[in-house]
């Protein structure tokens, strides 16, 4: 049995080699010839699964994507050909939420505001948007949710109309899939008309899919130079990046928002376990068992946390400025976008760190943000 896997999928070779012969190749450049005599295909979002890719897939029975998004896969085509498909919904939600939170904490420091004075509008209330809302509201921040499809399906959460959210939110963060048809298409959801409505003191973050924002219109909006802030982890035509847009962005990164080590391990193990079930195999993987020990496993707090403490704690684990600096330094080199993703550092999630302190430290909200917490009277570092 041959299993073709994106070479950037962590832990995949060790896991899938238990089931058959593993072939590793760059996901973005897979061709139809690569799928000859292949039984299973394991990919990430850079691989487009379509009729052209499957033209010579004479034995393919299973496709798994170790990502939450699925817009890169023609699922109707797979159903037509009798090929089983699975994804990893929610695998990256923690990493994306922590990316957004890092952006907020750094911008608050740079622009001189408190995150607790800002209203965050979350467009897209799926796995990522919902988790982000839970984290932010858990520490006392005000959140607005917008998701017309979920609202129409009877989701009982409180939703805000897009027009209202755009007016009331200080921060607008995007977490939708990319859709081009239907009643609520998200392609160019944030277009020139909407961008012109946004105030100079508002912040726009896109960590969803590049084409959700019209990048040409965004560039024109930022060129007005009125203080409007935009952050992009995804670009409309990635891996190509508009070099005129780049210097106008507060932060820019190469589609790595969800690239926490835990998230990547979850994605790989989710599709591995699904493939084992498909085969009727007894093998099973737990993502926690794959992870190394955190560099800073425990931090002791001597007093109740405040915003500055929160900034310090979160930046110990992840500071978006590190990725932004590397992106701007290296993006001009050939193939840099994919190389930065391929060789991305072992970023951890907040859950890798335990915060310890007395009852007067009020650690419960930090647990909602994702940290492990331990109430104790003495330092136990």
Swiss-Prot record:
Alphabetized PROSITE patterns for the sequence: D_2_HYDROXYACID_DH_3 (PS00671)
Annotated active site: 209, 238, 255
Subcellular location: Cytoplasm
Gene Ontology molecular function, alphabetical: 4-phosphoerythronate dehydrogenase activity; NAD binding; protein dimerization activity
Main location: cytoplasm
Protein name in UniProt: Erythronate-4-phosphate dehydrogenase
Catalysed reactions listed for this entry: 4-phospho-D-erythronate + NAD(+) = (R)-3-hydroxy-2-oxo-4-phosphooxybutanoate + NADH + H(+)
Any single biological process term in GO: 'de novo' pyridoxal 5'-phosphate biosynthetic process
HAMAP family the UniProt entry points to: PdxB
Role of this protein: Catalyzes the oxidation of erythronate-4-phosphate to 3-hydroxy-2-oxo-4-phosphonooxybutanoate.
Assigned GO CC terms: cytosol
CDD domains for the chain: ErythrP_dh (cd12158)
EC number: 1.1.1.290
Keywords: Cytoplasm, NAD, Oxidoreductase, Pyridoxine biosynthesis
Similarity comment: Belongs to the D-isomer specific 2-hydroxyacid dehydrogenase family. PdxB subfamily.
Gene source species: Vibrio cholerae serotype O1 (strain ATCC 39315 / El Tor Inaba N16961)
Binding positions for substrate per the UniProt entry: 45, 67, 259
Binding site for NAD(+): 127-128, 147, 176, 233, 258
UniProt pathway: Cofactor biosynthesis; pyridoxine 5'-phosphate biosynthesis; pyridoxine 5'-phosphate from D-erythrose 4-phosphate: step 2/5
Entry superkingdom: Bacteria
Pfam families per record: 2-Hacid_dh (PF00389), 2-Hacid_dh_C (PF02826), DUF3410 (PF11890)
Subunit structure: Homodimer.
């Amino acid at each position: 049995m041959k299993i073709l896997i994106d070479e950037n999928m962590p832990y995949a070779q060790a896991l899938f080699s238990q089931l058959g012969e593993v072939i590793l190749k760059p996901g973005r450049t897979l061709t139809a010839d690569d799928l000859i005599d292949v039984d299973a295909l394991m990919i990430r979002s850079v691989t487009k699964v379509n009729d052209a890719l499957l033209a010579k897939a004479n034995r393919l029975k299973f496709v798994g994507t170790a990502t939450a998004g699925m817009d890169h896969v023609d699922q109707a085509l797979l159903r037509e050909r009798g090929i089983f498909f699975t994804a990893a919904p929610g695998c990256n939600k923690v990493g994306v939420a922590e990316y957004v939170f890092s952006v907020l904490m750094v911008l608050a420091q740079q622009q001189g505001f408190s995150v607790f004075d800002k209203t965050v509008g979350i467009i897209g209330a799926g796995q990522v948007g919902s988790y982000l809302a839970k984290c932010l509201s858990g520490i006392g921040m005000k959140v607005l949710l917008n998701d017309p499809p979920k609202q129409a399906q009877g989701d009982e959460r409180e939703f805000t109309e897009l027009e209202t959210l755009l007016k009331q939110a200080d921060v607008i963060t995007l977490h939708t899939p990319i859709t081009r048809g239907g009643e609520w298409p998200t392609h160019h959801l944030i277009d020139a008309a909407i961008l012109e409505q946004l105030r100079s003191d508002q912040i726009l973050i896109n960590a969803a899919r590049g084409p959700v924002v019209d990048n040409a219109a965004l560039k024109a909006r930022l060129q007005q130079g009125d203080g409007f802030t935009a952050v992009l982890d995804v670009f409309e035509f990635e891996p190509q990046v508009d070099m005129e847009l780049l210097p106008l962005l507060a932060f820019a990164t190469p589609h790595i928002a969800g690239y926490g080590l835990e998230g990547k391990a979850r994605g790989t193990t989710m599709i591995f376990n699904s493939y084992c079930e498909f085969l009727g195999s007894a093998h099973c993987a737990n993502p926690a068992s794959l992870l190394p020990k955190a560099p800073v496993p425990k931090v002791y707090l001597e007093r109740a946390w405040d915003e500055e403490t929160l900034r310090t704690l979160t930046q110990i684990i992840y500071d978006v400025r590190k990725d932004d600096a590397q992106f701007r330094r290296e993006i001009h080199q050939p193939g840099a976008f994919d190389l930065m993703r391929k060789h991305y550092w072992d970023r951890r999630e907040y859950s890798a760190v335990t915060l310890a302190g007395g009852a007067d430290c009020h650690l419960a909200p930090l647990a909602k943000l994702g940290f492990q917490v331990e109430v104790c009277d003495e330092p136990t570092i």
